[in-house]
C-alpha cells in the first residue's frame, strides 16, 4: 500500500499597509473670515493674503482661537509708529456717518513694561490715503480695559484724547467688545453693557478697523487671543 505523501502547507501572512492622511495644521483663516484683512508684522512686513497663512506672530491654538504673539523689543516698526505690532488691518475705509461695527471676544496676557497693549482700533486715514491719528484705541493696561478716544480732528501725534475706563480688574479673562458707528455716533459695549456713547461729528478723517497685538512698550512679551472677530 502506497503511503500518501505529506505536502507541507505554509500560510503566508499578508501585511497590509494603509495610507493614513496626515492632519494638516489649522491656520487662522480656516476658522476666521480674513478675506477682508491684511496683517502688519515686525520688519515692518505686510501680508496681504491671509488664506492659509500663519507664523510665530499669528497662529491658531489648540482651542481654535486666533493668537497674536509679540516680543516688544523686536525691531522694525511702521514709519509713523514707535512700537512693533502683530495687527490686522481691515481693508475697507469708511466715513463717520456710515453704519459700521466690530465685534470681538478677546483676552490678553503680557509681561510688558509698561503693561499696556492695544487690542482694537479705529484708525484714521486722509482722503489721499496718508496716515491720520487713531480715533479710538481699546487697550488693556495693568489688567484694566480702557478706551482712548480722540476729542479733536487735529492732525497731530499727541492730539487730545479722552481716557475711559471700560472694565476694572479684567486681568487675563476674555471680554466681549462691541464698537458700533451709527448716525455719526460711536457706541462701545462691554459684555453687552453700553459703556460709551459719543457724537463724532467733529471727526473729518476716513477710518478703518484694526485688531490684534499692538504694545505701547519696548520691553516684554504680549499675547492677544481672539475667540471671535467680525466686522460689518
Task: Explain the meaning of each model-derived region.
Residues 9-19:
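Bacterial N-terminal signal peptides
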Residues 104, 173-181, 186-188:
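Short tryptophan-centered beta-strand motifs in secreted/extracellular beta-sheet-rich domains
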Residues 26-87:
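Solvent-exposed N-terminal domain segments of exported/luminal and surface proteins
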Residues 147-176:
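Short, aromatic/His-centered strand-loop micro-motif at the edge of beta-sheets
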Residues 65-146:
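Secretory/extracellular carbohydrate-interaction modules
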Residues 28-32, 99-101, 114-115, 200-232:
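Ligand-recognition surfaces built from glycine- and aromatic
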Residues 1-11:
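Bacterial N-terminal signal peptides that target proteins for export
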Residues 21-25:
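Sec/Tat signal peptide C-region and signal peptidase I cleavage site
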Amino acid at each position: 500500500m502506497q503511503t500518501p505523501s505529506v505536502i507541507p502547507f505554509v500560510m503566508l501572512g499578508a501585511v497590509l499597509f494603509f495610507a493614513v492622511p496626515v492632519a494638516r495644521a489649522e491656520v487662522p483663516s480656516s476658522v476666521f473670515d480674513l478675506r477682508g484683512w491684511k496683517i502688519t508684522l515686525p520688519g515692518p512686513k505686510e501680508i496681504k493674503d491671509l488664506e492659509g497663512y500663519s507664523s510665530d506672530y499669528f497662529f491658531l491654538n489648540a482651542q481654535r482661537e486666533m493668537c497674536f504673539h509679540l516680543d516688544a523689543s523686536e525691531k522694525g516698526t511702521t514709519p509713523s509708529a514707535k512700537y512693533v505690532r502683530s495687527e490686522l488691518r481691515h481693508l475697507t475705509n469708511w466715513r463717520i456717518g456710515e453704519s459700521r461695527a466690530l465685534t470681538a471676544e478677546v483676552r490678553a496676557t503680557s509681561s510688558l513694561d509698561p503693561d499696556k497693549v492695544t487690542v482694537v482700533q479705529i484708525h484714521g486715514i486722509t482722503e489721499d490715503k496718508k496716515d491720520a491719528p487713531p480715533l479710538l484705541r481699546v487697550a488693556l493696561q495693568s489688567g484694566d480695559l480702557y478706551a482712548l478716544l480722540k476729542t479733536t480732528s487735529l492732525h497731530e501725534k499727541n492730539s487730545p484724547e479722552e481716557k475711559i475706563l471700560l472694565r476694572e480688574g479684567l486681568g487675563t479673562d476674555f471680554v466681549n467688545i462691541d464698537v458700533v458707528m451709527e448716525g455719526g455716533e460711536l457706541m462701545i459695549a462691554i459684555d453687552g453693557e453700553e459703556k460709551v456713547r459719543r457724537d463724532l461729528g467733529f471727526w473729518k478723517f476716513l477710518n478703518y478697523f484694526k485688531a490684534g497685538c499692538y504694545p505701547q512698550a519696548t520691553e516684554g512679551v504680549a499675547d492677544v487671543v481672539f475667540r471671535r472677530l467680525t466686522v460689518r
